[in-house]
């Protein structure tokens, strides 16, 4: 990727959900380091675009191309997209009963470290960074030991996602209705 190339380039994207075409001829370029805001009416496809870019299997790409950091994003599965530096916050983050928050986030961080050729974080190093991130976001440290989003308020869910974002340090973050909850 040249410095002048966009980090994300979407060209003439068409997406179907079931029998319905939801996105028609969507094109956009997002430069690296840019803040890009996509606004539109309810039901106009903003969340669909984010979920499609993240690789959600419900959304079928019927045409167009998407390049992320110079690579064919559509050729990657959801995990490869995340490892490449793509992050999606959900409109309504799901509960994950039985999965401890600190273990879930550490696993994701270490998968990204591995994909970058970096050393995985041990529990001690990860916990130090996670505690700092939680404190900056006004989250009690005890949330790190709770199951992911289980029993969290709407605001706690969103701040928990922001903590994940801070710890993962993605190349591109799509924040879907970050103020909901």
Per-segment meaning from a language model:
Residues 39-44:
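The feature captures the beta-strand-to-loop junction immediately N-terminal to the Walker
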Residues 20-21, 36, 80:
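Short coil-to-beta microelement around the adenine-binding A-loop and adjacent beta1/P-loop entry
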Residues 54:
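Helix-to-loop junction immediately C-terminal to a conserved catalytic motif
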Residues 94-171:
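ABC-family P-loop ATPase nucleotide-binding domains
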């Amino acid at each position: 990727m040249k410095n002048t190339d966009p980090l994300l380039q979407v060209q003439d994207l068409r997406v179907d959900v079931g029998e319905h075409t939801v996105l028609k001829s969507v094109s956009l370029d997002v430069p690296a380091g840019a803040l890009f805001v996509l606004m539109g009416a309810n039901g106009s496809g903003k969340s669909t675009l984010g979920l499609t870019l993240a690789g959600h299997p419900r959304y079928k790409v019927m045409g167009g191309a998407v390049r992320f950091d110079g690579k064919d994003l559509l050729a990657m599965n959801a995990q490869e997209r995340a490892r490449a530096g793509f992050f999606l916050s959900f409109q309504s983050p799901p509960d994950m009963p039985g999965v401890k928050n600190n273990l879930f986030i550490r696993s994701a961080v270490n998968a990204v470290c591995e994909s970058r050729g970096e050393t995985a974080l041990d529990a001690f190093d990860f916990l130090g960074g996670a505690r700092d991130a939680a404190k900056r976001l006004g989250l009690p440290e005890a949330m790190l030991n709770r199951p992911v989003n289980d029993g969290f308020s709407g605001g706690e869910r969103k701040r928990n996602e922001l903590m994940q974002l801070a710890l993962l340090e993605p190349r591109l973050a799509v924040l879907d209705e970050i103020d909901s909850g």
